[in-house]
Design a protein with these regions (language model features):
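Low-complexity, intrinsically disordered Ser/Thr/Pro- and acidic-rich segments
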Residues: 23-27
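Extreme N-terminal basic, low-complexity initiation segments
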Residues: 1-11
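Extreme N-terminal starter segment of soluble prokaryotic enzymes
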Residues: 47-51
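Polybasic, lysine-rich low-complexity intrinsically disordered segments
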Residues: 5-6, 29-32
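Local cysteine-cluster metal-coordination motifs and their immediate loop/turn environment
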Residues: 56-67
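Conserved non-cysteine loop/helix-boundary elements of the Radical SAM core domain that shape
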Residues: 69-93, 97-201
Length: 201
C-alpha cells in the first residue's frame, strides 16, 4: 500500500525489475531460452519484442490493485531520469531485434506530463530499432484526461490508450476506491476520441 515512509530504494528496485518485459514468446520457447540462453528466444519465428515501462506513482491506492505503486510523487522526476538511463544501459539487450510495441503502465502514467512521457518514448527511439514499431500505449485514469493533455500526447507518438474505467457503476467505483465516477469515465472516452485516439481499451 502507498506509504510516505517507504524506502525510495524499494521504489527504484521495483522499477528496474519491471522495466523490461519481452512479450509474444510462446511458453515452450521461453522455457527453452531460460534453460539455454536468451539468444534461443530471439532466433525463433514467433518472437516479438516489446518494451514495458512501469510508472509506479499513484495519488491513491485502489483496493483491487496488487501492482507496485507509491504516493511519493516528489520522486517522479528522479525516477523518470533513472528510467531514461536504464533504457540506454540496456541498449544491447534485444540484440538489434526491432521493437514492435511500447507499453507504459503503472501505477498511473497519466500523472506524467505528455512531454515527460514523450522524453521516454524519444529515448526508446534513439536507442532501439523502432522500424517495426506499431503501437505505443499509455495507461491513464479518466480524471486525468483533458483535451490539452490528450492532444499533446498524440503529438508525442502515442496511438493507444488504456483507460482505467473499471466500471460505469458509481457504487462499484466507490467500493474499489477509484477517484472518478461514471460520468467522468464517459467524458474521458469522448475527449480521447475527439483528440484522435481510435484504439481505446
Amino acid at each position: 500500500r502507498p506509504d510516505e515512509k517507504k524506502d525510495p530504494g524499494d521504489l527504484y528496485m521495483s522499477l528496474f525489475f519491471h522495466i523490461f518485459v519481452i512479450i509474444g514468446i510462446r511458453a515452450e520457447t521461453a522455457r527453452k531460452g531460460m534453460h539455454n540462453n536468451r539468444t534461443d528466444c530471439f532466433n525463433t519465428p514467433d518472437f516479438m519484442a516489446g518494451i514495458y515501462i512501469h510508472i509506479p506513482f499513484c495519488k491513491s491506492k485502489c483496493h483491487y490493485c496488487d501492482f507496485y505503486s507509491c504516493t511519493l510523487l516528489a520522486k517522479k522526476e528522479a525516477v523518470l531520469a533513472a528510467v531514461a538511463d536504464e533504457l540506454a544501459c540496456r541498449a544491447g539487450f534485444l540484440q538489434g531485434e526491432p521493437v514492435r510495441t511500447v507499453y507504459v503502465g503503472g501505477g498511473t502514467p497519466s500523472l506524467c506530463t505528455p512531454s515527460e512521457l514523450g522524453a521516454l518514448i524519444g529515448r526508446i527511439r534513439d536507442v532501439y530499432d523502432v522500424s517495426g514499431l506499431q503501437e505505443v500505449t499509455v495507461e491513464a485514469n479518466p480524471d486525468d484526461l483533458t483535451a490539452d493533455w490528450l492532444t499533446a500526447l498524440r503529438v508525442e507518438g502515442v496511438n493507444r490508450l488504456s483507460i482505467g474505467i473499471q466500471s460505469f457503476i458509481d457504487r462499484d467505483l466507490r467500493w474499489m476506491h477509484r477517484r472518478h465516477d461514471a460520468a467522468s469515465a464517459v467524458r474521458a472516452v469522448g475527449e480521447a476520441q475527439r483528440a484522435g485516439f481510435e484504439n481505446l481499451t
